[in-house]
Regions:
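Contiguous, glycine/small-aliphatic-enriched amphipathic segments in soluble metabolic enzymes
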Residues: 1-158
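A contiguous, basic/glycine-rich beta-loop/short-helix subdomain that forms a polymer-engagement track
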Residues: 154, 163-170
Length: 170
């Protein structure tokens, strides 16, 4: 586009969107496989919880998801930390606009969530205190509860640590 605007390009590009699509197919080897998946996601975007919402790599991925309109991201984490990382990375993510931040320290659903978690797991050794603590601290558990209670359609977790540590909450 810059070459066309400056007059350096010898052949004008009539359809910039199609041209970019062709270029992306060269860059991404998985484009052939992923294209129909992305098209389906764009047609019906879902609410996806990112359990490690404070992580820089997660935020970079969320920016791509927002830019491509693939889903409505829900980030679990402390708003101050998330917003600081968004600013540091110069991202265009805004709570309440193109993302939602779930602050486990003051979410109004906290009581319902820990009580439900306790009722479901009390026979497995989960005490009331443990339920309260885990629903406040375990981001994968928070994500799973959001999905279970219909507040999200899916979740992504396990970007750090071992997967089996996250899967026990799913």
């Amino acid at each position: 586009k810059a070459a066309m605007d400056s007059g350096v390009a010898t052949l004008p590009i009539t359809d910039m969107k199609a041209y970019r699509q062709r270029l992306s197919e060269f860059v991404y080897n998985s484009a052939f496989v992923m294209k129909p998946i992305f098209a389906r996601a764009k047609a019906d975007p879902k609410r996806i919880v990112y359990c490690e919402g404070e992580d820089s790599n997660v935020l970079l991925a969320v920016q791509v998801v927002v830019d491509e309109q693939l889903a409505y991201p829900i980030l679990v984490g402390r708003p101050a930390v998330i917003e600081k990382n968004i600013e540091k990375l110069a991202l265009r993510l805004k709570d309440g606009e193109n993302i939602t931040i779930i602050n486990q320290d003051d979410d109004p659903r906290y009581k319902d969530y820990w009580q439900g978690y306790y009722e479901k797991n009390k026979r497995n050794g989960v005490s009331i205190e443990l339920a309260r603590r885990d629903v406040r601290r375990k981001t994968s558990l928070i994500g799973a509860l959001l999905v279970e209670n219909g507040d999200a359609d899916g979740m992504i977790c396990g970007t750090f640590s071992y997967s089996h540590l996250h899967l026990k909450y799913v």
